Amino acid sequence: MENYTYIEMRERPDLMQAAARWFHEKWGIPKEAYLSCMDAYLRGETEYGWYLCLDGEKIIGGMGVIENDFHDRKDLAPNVCAVYTEEDYRCKGIAGHLLNMVVKDMNAKGFCPLYLVTDHTSFYERYGWEFLCMVQGDGEPQMTRMYIRR
């Protein structure tokens, strides 16, 4: 297995700008939205964290936790969001490691269950997530899958 570094953002607050830019490039959500969430986390205003995988100093994977990942089921919170691994680094266990890290960290902070919206149909089950229901994404014509991690 490769020697990657897995961190939560409080360990490396210096990466906030680079991480916000990276997530913005992957998902198209304004960089400022990521900066706002990350800054609140770094200042201790929320325990909803941000998690990264680094190859040296290069961000190659990441995800965060927010109240609601742009869907109509506001009662299902918090949500793991922005799950992404760079294409050249896929199938190496990075996303799975990050998911397990997030679950462990959030459970230790008293957050259980966690939720996640995705169009994937088998990936998350490998890491203990279960399909819960279909939800309507904000401004989306199609319903999307909601998973739960108890």
Give a label for each model feature.
Residues 48, 141-146:
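Short hydrophobic/aromatic beta-strand or adjacent loop that forms the aromatic wall/cage
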Residues 54-56, 149-150:
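Active-site beta-strand termini and strand-to-loop segments that position acidic
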Residues 27-54, 60:
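Active-site rim helix/loop that mediates acceptor-substrate recognition in acyltransferases
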Residues 1-14, 150:
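Conserved N-terminal entry element of GNAT/NAT acetyltransferase domains
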Residues 52, 58-68, 79, 84:
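Conserved beta-strand in the GNAT
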Residues 108, 112, 118-142:
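Conserved active-site alpha-helix within GNAT-family acetyltransferase domains
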Residues 82-85, 91-104, 116:
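Conserved acetyl-CoA-binding loop-helix of GNAT-fold acetyltransferases
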Residues 73, 86-97, 109, 126:
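Conserved glycine-rich acetyl-CoA-binding loop
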